[in-house]
C-alpha cells in the first residue's frame, strides 16, 4: 500500500481547487474564476485499493508585497515542505512568465519530486506550444508532464496512476471514508464565502471574510448564525442588495450546499458586518489564513 502528502501549487485561477474536488469526488475547496479564492491550505483525501493520497490545495502563487499576499504565499511555501510530491498546475491558456520561472525555481530548489500538470486541455485557444517550449528550456522531462481537464475529468485516472508511481509504501493516515479533515465550522464558512464571491463575481474577493458565530446541532438540523465581514461601508450595500435580495440569495444557495454536504437540513442566518480596513490588519490576516 502506498500513501503520501501531495501539494497542489500554481498561479491563480489555474484550476487547482477544481482538480482537488475532481480527484476526491467532493466539493472540498471553493472554486471561482476570481484569482486567489483559496486562502488556506485545504486538505483533500483520496483512498482506493492502492493506498491513500492526501492533497493540499494552496492559494494561487502571485508575486506581491502586500501583507495579504505575503500571508497567502507563506501557506504555499509551508505546503511544499510538508509534502513528498508537488503537483504544479499550469493553465493551458496562460503565457509562461515571471511567476512560472519563480515557481519552478522554488520546486527545483526544494529537491522534492514533482509533476507538471497542464490543465484545461478541453479549451481550444491555448498557449500549449509556448508552455511546452518553456518547460523544455527548463529541462523538464516529458515523463513529468501530464495534460488534463479537471473540469471535464479528462486524464484524471491517468494522473492518479502517475501520482501513485511517485509515492512510497506507507500507512493510511486517515480512515478510508474521510475525504477531508476540515472542521465543520471552516467548511461552512468557506461555503458561504464561496457563494458570496460567485454572486458578486469580481467586486469583493479580497474585501470579505466569513465567521461562524453560532453552530449548533439540534436533533434533525443544524442551526447556524454567520457573519459576512466587509472592509468598507459601501461594500455592505453591495452584498445586501436592493431590498435585501442579495443577502437572501446568498443565504438560500449556501443553505442548499451546506445541507447537501452535511447531509442534514440547516437553518442559516446571515448578517453583513463592517470591520473597517480589516484587510490591512496583519494580525487578523494571519489568523484568517492560518
UniProtKB/Swiss-Prot annotation:
It comes from the Bacteria. It is a peripheral membrane protein. InterPro entries: AAA+_ATPase, G_ERA_dom, GTP-bd, GTPase_Era-like, KH_dom-like_a/b, KH_dom_type_2, KH_sf_prok-type, P-loop_NTPase. Residues 200-276 form the KH type-2 domain. Residues 10-17 are annotated as: G1. Residues 57-60 are annotated as: G3. Residues 119-122 are annotated as: G4. Residues 2-169 form the Era-type G domain. It holds the Pfam family MMR_HSR1. An essential GTPase that binds both GDP and GTP, with rapid nucleotide exchange. Plays a role in 16S rRNA processing and 30S ribosomal subunit biogenesis and possibly also in cell cycle regulation and energy metabolism. HAMAP family: GTPase_Era (MF_00367). PANTHER family: GTPASE ERA (PTHR42698), GTPASE ERA, MITOCHONDRIAL (PTHR42698:SF1). This is GTPase Era. The lineage of its organism: Bacteria, Pseudomonadati, Spirochaetota, Spirochaetia, Spirochaetales. The gene is era.
Amino acid at each position: 500500500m502506498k500513501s503520501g502528502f501531495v501539494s497542489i501549487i500554481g498561479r491563480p485561477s489555474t484550476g487547482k481547487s477544481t482538480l482537488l474536488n475532481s480527484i476526491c469526488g467532493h466539493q472540498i475547496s471553493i472554486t471561482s474564476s476570481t484569482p486567489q479564492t483559496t486562502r488556506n491550505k485545504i486538505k483533500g483525501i483520496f483512498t482506493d485499493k492502492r493506498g491513500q493520497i492526501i492533497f493540499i490545495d494552496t492559494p494561487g502563487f502571485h508575486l506581491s508585497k502586500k501583507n495579504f499576499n505575503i500571508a497567502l504565499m507563506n501557506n504555499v511555501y509551508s505546503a511544499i515542505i510538508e509534502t513528498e510530491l508537488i503537483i504544479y498546475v499550469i493553465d493551458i491558456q496562460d503565457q509562461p512568465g515571471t511567476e512560472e520561472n519563480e515557481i519552478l525555481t522554488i520546486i527545483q530548489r526544494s529537491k522534492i519530486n514533482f509533476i507538471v500538470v497542464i490543465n484545461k486541455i478541453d479549451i481550444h485557444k491555448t498557449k500549449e506550444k509556448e508552455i511546452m517550449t518553456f518547460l523544455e528550456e527548463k529541462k523538464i522531462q516529458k515523463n513529468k508532464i501530464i495534460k488534463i481537464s479537471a473540469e471535464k475529468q479528462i486524464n484524471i485516472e491517468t494522473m492518479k496512476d502517475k501520482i501513485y508511481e511517485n509515492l512510497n509504501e506507507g500507512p493510511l493516515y486517515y480512515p478510508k471514508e474521510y475525504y477531508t479533515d476540515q472542521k465543520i465550522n471552516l467548511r461552512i464558512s468557506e461555503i458561504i464565502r464561496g457563494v458570496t464571491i460567485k454572486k458578486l463575481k469580481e467586486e469583493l474577493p479580497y474585501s470579505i471574510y466569513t465567521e461562524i458565530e453560532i453552530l449548533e446541532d439540534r436533533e434533525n438540523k443544524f442551526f447556524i448564525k454567520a457573519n459576512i465581514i466587509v472592509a468598507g461601508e459601501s461594500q455592505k450595500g453591495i452584498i445586501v442588495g436592493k431590498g435585501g435580495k442579495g443577502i437572501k440569495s446568498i443565504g438560500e444557495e449556501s443553505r442548499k450546499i451546506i445541507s447537501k454536504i452535511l447531509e442534514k437540513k440547516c437553518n442559516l442566518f446571515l448578517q453583513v458586518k463592517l470591520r473597517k480596513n480589516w484587510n490591512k490588519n496583519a494580525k487578523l490576516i494571519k489568523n484568517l489564513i492560518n
